[in-house]
Amino acid sequence: MERIRIAIIVPFANVFYSGGVTVQGRMWKEGLEELGNIVDLVDNWGKFDWNTYDYIIILGNGKLLLDYMFLLRGFKHPQIISAPIIDYHKSFFSFVLRSRYFGSVRLKINKPFHDLYYCRNMFDFYLVRSEYESRFIEKGFHIDIKKIYKLPLNFRIPMRYLKNIDFEKKENFCFHSSRLGSPGKNVERLIKAAIKYDFNLVLAGSIKGHEQESWLHRLIDGHHNIQYVGWLSDEELYDYYSRAKVFALPSIIEGVGMVALEASIFGCEIILTNIGAPKEYFNGMAHLVNPYDIDDIGLKIKKALLGVGYQPRLRKYILNRNNSDYCMKELDSVLRKNQKER
């Protein structure tokens, strides 16, 4: 089978190795290369012969999108694919307004959704992760549905870590891992729910700078049921997944919720935002919450800690549907279907 040559570009400045978009890019590279393809992650230092690529995937949205598109459209062979990140949490109508009118290419007023809208017809096709993203691209940008391919995102955990789970040994706490200071992760309401409903909460992840550190300690100091364990290595993270009875992701802004997928295959009950795309991945087997409602968050976590939930059915479902082998073959199939002759 002929190898496909692919370049993946992230169109924004990035300083976080563990950011969701860059993690997705590395997973795609690894998975597609295991199928025999050639994948380059583009940076500013390498030498790239653009006309040797079959595809250039623009992964995500950002301020560098226009620069890349204006430069790359001069190369004739590669097809350019958009794999956008649509985690918009307000109304569809406001998304349409924002994407069409909030920004100006002529005046160099760059806004990610406006820039994506401006470039919408420059892409050969789109790769989306959910029906939620598909609707925004099809209806918001007026893109033919035949040019939109929905591909599930795979979890990144190697199968060797996914031993059988002893649910009887699960510990009675709720776990959360994220960029804790990001407003979209809604950590403050999660903490307030733990304080009000007195359940054990373990927080992990990054906090940026002294201001965020002070903010976190103001919220949790003096509350012995809440613990911050810092940034975790992968092995440490997997250990907390395997021990926790519940994982909570009550985000206001969330694209897929990779950490919730990961936690589910370690046997956690999942508390999940009812906003946006993440709920599509769980087939009705997550406890959905209104992320603005502390009581809803707290009561659903307490219920899940009592053992009311969807495991082990959820674990089996995610292992079957979101493993790397299945998802990468789906992506490879789409690329081969649309491949042009050299």
Where are these predicted regions, by residue range?
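A charged, aromatic-enriched C-terminal amphipathic alpha-helix characteristic of glycosyltransferases
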Residues: 20, 306-342
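Membrane-proximal helix-turn-helix segments that form the acceptor-binding/catalytic region
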Residues: 104-126
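Conserved donor-binding/catalytic core segment of Leloir-type glycosyltransferases
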Residues: 166-185, 191-195, 202
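Nucleotide-activated donor-binding/catalytic signature segment of Leloir-type glycosyltransferases, i.e.
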Residues: 214-235
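Short alpha-helical donor nucleotide-sugar binding micro-motif in glycosyltransferases
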Residues: 231-232, 239-244
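Aromatic "clamp/platform" in nucleotide-sugar-dependent glycosyltransferases that forms part
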Residues: 252
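Short hydrophobic beta-strand element within catalytic cores of glycosyltransferases
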Residues: 260, 269-272
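Conserved acidic donor-binding segment of nucleotide-sugar-dependent glycosyltransferases
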Residues: 286-294, 302-308
